[in-house]
C-alpha cells in the first residue's frame, strides 16, 4: 500500500516505501516525515478518473473560451485574503476602460460576494458548492463549464473565476483558465509559501494584499518574497492594498495586457 501523489506536471503515482520509477524526474529527498495514508488500487483508480475527467472538461472550457476570444483568469486565496474587495476595484476599472468582464463566483454558501460584484457592469454567475458534507472546498472544470452556460461568452473579453476560499484545494483542479493568480494577505505570515507550496507554485501572479496594515504587523516582506521565490521564482508579484487602492494600477495594467494578447 502507498500514498497517492500528484505532481505539478500532472503525473500521478503512489509511494510504497520502496524504490519506484515513473516518467517524470523529481527528488524525494525533501519529503521529510510527512504523514501518509493507506490507499489501494480502487482508491487510486477513482482519483485518477476524477483528475482525468476534470482535465478533459478543462480542455473543453479552454476551447470554448478560445472560440469566443475570452481570456480566463482563475483567482484563488485563503478565506478573507481580500479577493472580493480586489475584484470590486478591478471590475470598476475594467468598466471604465470598456473591458467586458464576466464572473463565476464560487462560495460554499450564500450570494454575499456575488451580490457585491453585481453592481460593476459584469455578468455574474453564482456557484454554491454547499451540497454534500460541508461543501466542496474548490471549483472544478465541470462546475465552471456548467456556470459558463449562464453567461453570454460571445459578449465577453475576460472571465474571472473567483474560486472558493482555500489555500490548497483550488490549485489542484484545472478549471480551464489561461492565467492563475492568488491574493495573499500579509496577515497570513511569511512562511506560507513553504508550508503550503501547491497554490504558490501553480500561480502566474501573486497579489500581496493588505499592505496598508504593514506598519501595524511584524511582517517581513522581503522574507516572504524570498520564500515565494524558493517555490516559484517566476511568479509576477504585485504589492497592493485592495482597501486603499495603493498598487492596483500596475495590476490593472498587467491584467489589461493579458486580455489584449
PLM features per residue range, with description:
Residues 1-42:
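Histidine-centered metal-binding segments
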Residues 78-79, 104, 185-186, 206-219, ...:
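G-domain G4 guanine-recognition motif of GTPases
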Residues 86:
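Hydrophobic positions on the alpha1 helix immediately C-terminal to the Walker A/P-loop
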Residues 93-100, 205-207, 234-236:
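Short, surface-exposed connector motifs at secondary-structure boundaries
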Residues 179, 204-205:
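Well-ordered beta-strand positions
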Amino acid at each position: 500500500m502507498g500514498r497517492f501523489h500528484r505532481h505539478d506536471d500532472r503525473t500521478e503515482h503512489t509511494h510504497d516505501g520502496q524504490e519506484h520509477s515513473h516518467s517524470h524526474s523529481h527528488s524525494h529527498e525533501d519529503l521529510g516525515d510527512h504523514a501518509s495514508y493507506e490507499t489501494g488500487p480502487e482508491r487510486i483508480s477513482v482519483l485518477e478518473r476524477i483528475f482525468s475527467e476534470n482535465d478533459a472538461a478543462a480542455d473543453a472550457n479552454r476551447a470554448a473560451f478560445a472560440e469566443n476570444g475570452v481570456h480566463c483568469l482563475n483567482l484563488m486565496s485563503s478565506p478573507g485574503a481580500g479577493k472580493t474587495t480586489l475584484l470590486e476595484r478591478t471590475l470598476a476599472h475594467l468598466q471604465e476602460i470598456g473591458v467586458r468582464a464576466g464572473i463565476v463566483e464560487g462560495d460554499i454558501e450564500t450570494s454575499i460576494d456575488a451580490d457585491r460584484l453585481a453592481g460593476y457592469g459584469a455578468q455574474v454567475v453564482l456557484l454554491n458548492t454547499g451540497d454534500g458534507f460541508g461543501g466542496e472546498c474548490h471549483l472544478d472544470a465541470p462546475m465552471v463549464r456548467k456556470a459558463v452556460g449562464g453567461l453570454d461568452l460571445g459578449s465577453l473579453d475576460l472571465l474571472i473565476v473567483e474560486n472558493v476560499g482555500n489555500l490548497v484545494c483550488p490549485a489542484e483542479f484545472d478549471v480551464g483558465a489561461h492565467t492563475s493568480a492568488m491574493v495573499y494577505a500579509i496577515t497570513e505570515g511569511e512562511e506560507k509559501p513553504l508550508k503550503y507550496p501547491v497554490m504558490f507554485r501553480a500561480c502566474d501572479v501573486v497579489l500581496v494584499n493588505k499592505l496598508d496594515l504593514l506598519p501595524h504587523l511584524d511582517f517581513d516582506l522581503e522574507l516572504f518574497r524570498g520564500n515565494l521565490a524558493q517555490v516559484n521564482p517566476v511568479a509576477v508579484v504585485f504589492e497592493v492594498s485592495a482597501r486603499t487602492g495603493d498598487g492596483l494600477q500596475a495590476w490593472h495594467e498587467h491584467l489589461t495586457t493579458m486580455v489584449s494578447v
